[in-house]
């Protein structure tokens, strides 16, 4: 029996991109992709028709528009229509191509044939419904920051990945030479995606450990303090996590935080200072930024 899917198309202000991806993930979409369209951003997302009806999609569209109003941004244009299984499986993937990030990494979709030669570290990925394809500015900023942090003696570094999504930051860390990563995500689909992508990149399970949970879960997975902490989620959640980060940190632990809009810099900076963290560098890409931090 052929499954029928809803394809949602959301044309939005680029500043809404991460919020919309979060909403779609929370809604239960199984595949998401985005691309620049002039001054706007077009997001496509897919959900089984059997699980959602028109009223569900209308309610989702209303939430997306309310998010825009609260952010003082134009309301997104939301449309949806039905497609069959074959169209779904190929549609969102066709909009995602290999992506060079920094000086060393190449993010490569799992369904493409592996290149016979590449001077870059090949990070193969099939995100499924989890956030993190490498296309988003915040993911790129985090990977570039990891490349800098792991440039010297990476083999000693044990890293916590909070909100691991597809596992892209954990895998990137390990390809760049880190000793071990421990990732957590509240979404079980993200845990599944991370483990699948770990296997796709031939990484041993003991080097990349993933579990459902949040920052409080990490000490149960690894009782020692971490050398590094990476976190690429919404700024509001990062503000809640910062007071808990010292409990899993050493005096010289570093951190990489993103998912933060430029207008959200000040509340993040204030919360870091109040909790004993110093900003070593602040990187920006378009309307997004990435905090490189260390213990103060």
Curated annotation (Swiss-Prot):
Organism the protein comes from: Picosynechococcus sp. (strain ATCC 27264 / PCC 7002 / PR-6)
Gene Ontology CC annotation, any one: cytoplasm
Cell compartments where the protein resides: Cytoplasm
A Pfam family matched in the record: PrmA
Name of this chain's protein: Ribosomal protein L11 methyltransferase
Keywords: Cytoplasm, Methyltransferase, S-adenosyl-L-methionine, Transferase
InterPro entries: Ribosomal_L11_MeTrfase_PrmA, Ribosomal_PrmA_MeTrfase, SAM-dependent_MTases_sf
GO biological process: methylation
The keyword Methyltransferase is annotated on this UniProt entry: yes
Family: Belongs to the methyltransferase superfamily. PrmA family.
Gene3D superfamilies reported for this sequence: Vaccinia Virus protein VP39
Single GO MF annotation: protein-lysine N-methyltransferase activity
Main location (coarse class): cytoplasm
Membrane keyword on record: no
